[in-house]
Amino acid sequence: MKILIVEDEPSLRELMQKTLAKERYVVETADTFYEASLKIADYSYDCILLDIMLPDGNGLKLLEMLKEQQKRESIIIISARDSIEDKVLGLEQGADDYLPKPFHLAELNARIKSVLRRQRGDGSRSLQLGNLRIEPDSFRVFVGDKELELLKKEYDILFYFANRPNHIIDKAVLAEAVWGDHADDADNFHFVYAQMKNLRRKLA
């Protein structure tokens, strides 16, 4: 699962990035309105954590852009503006949740999991495809009653495909979704093919 953090305060941005990376999310960051607008235009995310008070623009305008582009990312506003009016405005403009600062990182993580469950449509804690069951909260995968031992990237690839049944997935899009910014460092897609080969072997 891929998350974009839009936050201009360096220490908070770094803390959120490290915490969410430990939760096995692919995490990218932007510290300005301009940088965030470029990332949102060029890439897709599962969830965006959006500060609305940015040095070069209002985060609510980014929310507006997402809706105009018919993007389907889940949006959690994180803001020091905690009045009822601010919360209502953010939610009415399309945010999925509104978390006032300061907040506990455990609560942030719980809210991310909650909006991602809602994004899947049924709000369930597991994803079932035939005899394959994925439990995103614990990163566990079962075929029938047998639990599979998957590496992190193998799990990420499987989860990406499982959330897009009957879709043709471009290898560049898959690499960017699973490896994030680091996908640009590769000259070819051998690393993607290698992980997929291992995954197919384990699923067989």
Segments from the language model and where they lie:
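Short coil/turn motifs that cap or connect alpha-helices
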Residues: G94, E135-D137, R164
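Pre-signature/interface helix of ABC/ABC-like ATPase nucleotide-binding domains
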Residues: E64, D82, R125, K146-L148, ...
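Positively charged, aromatic-enriched patches within helix-turn-helix-type DNA-binding elements
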Residues: R140, D145-A204
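N-terminal/domain-start alpha-helical segments
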Residues: M1-D122
